[in-house]
């Protein structure tokens, strides 16, 4: 069985993240969505909220394939989380050349530290290429319409978060 790990902060999960997740499910039998926990960052959504949003979004968009997705938290190196959960592939989404430059450096370092773990780059669909969680949060905080950029459950959660 092929297991892939897809790491990020997912604060919040966007249609771009879901696009990468769909691609990962074409490559692997099981995909672990690994939410990085960074002590220096204060996320908008708690870990539990992000898990719930990822799971709800996966069910709504991926239907039966959502059963092949699990969500975990990790701190430290993603390669350690990958090893712990038996992943052979590390999936990374690419929006543009800037992402590629950074991700190539990370893949090189990860490849040196964990040669058994193969990094796979998935280019974002042009329809979601410009979406970032940071921009989504900014638009939502100013009352803008974020529905084109995030799954339905996430749009509702963002609207609730910024109305309170």
UniProtKB/Swiss-Prot annotation:
Position of the signal peptide: none
Cofactor(s) the protein requires to work: Mg(2+)
Keywords: ATP-binding, Coenzyme A biosynthesis, Cytoplasm, Magnesium, Nucleotide-binding, Nucleotidyltransferase, Transferase
Positions of ATP binding: 9-10, 17, 93-95, 103, 128-134
Transition state stabilizer, annotated site positions: 17
Superkingdom, taxonomy of origin: Bacteria
Subcellular location: Cytoplasm
Top-level class of the enzyme under EC nomenclature: transferase
Catalyzed reactions: (R)-4'-phosphopantetheine + ATP + H(+) = 3'-dephospho-CoA + diphosphate
GO BP annotations listed: coenzyme A biosynthetic process
Enzyme Commission number(s) from the entry: 2.7.7.3
Gene3D superfamilies for this protein: HUPs (3.40.50.620)
Family classification: Belongs to the bacterial CoaD family.
Assembly and interaction partners: Homohexamer.
General function of this protein: Reversibly transfers an adenylyl group from ATP to 4'-phosphopantetheine, yielding dephospho-CoA (dPCoA) and pyrophosphate.
Name of the protein in its database record: Phosphopantetheine adenylyltransferase
Taxonomic source organism: Brucella abortus (strain 2308)
Primary gene name: coaD
């Amino acid at each position: 069985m092929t297991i892939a790990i897809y790491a990020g902060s997912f604060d919040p999960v966007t249609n771009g993240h879901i696009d990468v997740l769909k691609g990962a499910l074409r490559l692997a039998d099981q995909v672990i969505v690994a939410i990085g926990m960074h002590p220096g960052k204060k996320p908008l959504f708690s870990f539990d909220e992000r898990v719930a949003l990822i799971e709800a979004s996966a069910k709504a968009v991926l239907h039966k394939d959502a059963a092949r997705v699990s969500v975990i938290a990790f701190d430290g190196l993603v390669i350690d989380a990958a090893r712990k959960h038996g992943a052979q592939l590390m999936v990374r989404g690419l929006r543009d050349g800037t992402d590629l430059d950074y991700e190539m450096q990370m893949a090189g370092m990860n490849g040196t530290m964990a040669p058994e773990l193969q990094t796979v780059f998935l280019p974002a669909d042009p329809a979601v290429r410009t979406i970032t969680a940071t921009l989504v949060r900014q638009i939502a905080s100013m009352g803008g319409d974020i529905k084109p950029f995030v799954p339905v459950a996430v749009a509702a959660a963002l609207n609730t978060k910024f109305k309170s």
